[in-house]
Amino acid sequence: MSKNLEKLPNTIWILAAGLLCVGAGQSIVFITIPPIARDLGLNEIQIGSIFATSALAWMILSPIWGSLSDSVGRKKIVIVGLLGFAVSLILFSFTISLGQRELLTGSLLFLLLVAARVLNGIFGSATRPSSGGWVADISSTESRSRAFARLDSGFSMGRILGPAVAGLLLLVSYTAPFFFFATGAFIVIIFVTFQKSPAKFSSKETIKKLSMFDSRVWPFLIVSAGFGISNAALVQTSSFFFQDVITPSSDNYIALASIGFMLSALGVLNGQLLIADRLQTSPGSLVKLGVILNFFALTGYAFSTSLVEVYICLFFYGLGGGMLGPGISSSLSLSVGKEYQGAAGGFLGMVIPVGHVISPLVSMPLYMLSPSLPYLLGASLMFFAMIFIFTNKRHKWIRDKNYREDRNLEVFENSQ
């Protein structure tokens, strides 16, 4: 490698640890709550409502928290986000415990579970945009994709560790995994407290509010939303795909699907920490390569008929997603001015859950028509994303690295 790696501040790893706790907490909820809630007497519609209300709150509040971090400072919003996330996990766990003891039942139990998850959506949505703004503040334009790759690797690692740790702690109690990662969030808060927050952006001029329809913003949100829908369709139907198509004669289809998603997560980490971070791949190249890989991986997945084929496709799908995530984050960060870093991250946090809201309405009916259709839908979205990024002027601006000449994008002074 011809150029030396620029040393990035350790603060990024601390912020990544916070996202690890958030990612682990989210994955634990997705895995454990459906069977637990069913045991508590809740039906499928109620269980779906618990998830949907949280996602809706996340979508609404994420851009608000991002803008607030621009004006009141990153550290305050990061701490508020982690604190609210930890408290919501504890309240959720406590409500489940009361339900298992039959001290809460029926509608009251359901409403309290919804309230706890809404609290998670309200405050948990603060962590990613404020952390992303912080990372942008303390990284140069040349190292921006590396910095975001490290930050996003925390959430990815949480998605891996969450189910693994939950599998062990569930032997202790149903609520132990929630308390474990809530405690982890409290510990991260302590470390964040001792980090020197970047200087707030100040200007004698009135700063115009950033719009998600700004030409510097929406081209990256479009690609992110397409990836989110593709990813949600894959995640929400793959267990059925393994059961119906790949291993129809096996009773271990859930375990086999879990192995596939572990391989996908391994691909994500390779995309983030090897290709984006270690190899210093530029943001524009990360987006381009990520979309292309996802297109071929989803197409291959749709026509797979064996475990080997599916596992290969899932690994390369994860690899593409691991490049696309930090590629979009760093591209959007470089596309807007330094006074809009939190707001831009907030918009990105708003569109990421879109897939989990839209996909159930589309992917399940498509799967009923043909098991391959949800993945062909995702491949189609990635195909159109390829055309878009090669024709859109702002994506070309990023690929040509014109942000190097934009004096408005100078990094904040790093006092680490």
Question: Could you say what each language-model-derived stretch is?
Answer:
Residues 83-106, 293-305:
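C-terminal ends and interior cores of transmembrane alpha-helices
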Residues 33, 126-139, 323-336:
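Intracellular juxtamembrane helix-capping segments at the cytosolic ends
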Residues 6-55, 219, 223, 228-247:
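Helix-loop boundary and gating motifs at the non-cytosolic
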Residues 49-67, 259-274:
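Central cavity-lining transmembrane alpha-helices of secondary-active solute carriers
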Residues 116-157:
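Cytoplasmic helix-loop-helix junction between adjacent transmembrane helices
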Residues 61-74, 270-283, 367:
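Helix-to-loop junctions at the C-terminal end of transmembrane segments
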Residues 283-328:
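C-terminal transmembrane helical hairpin of 12-TM major facilitator-type secondary transporters
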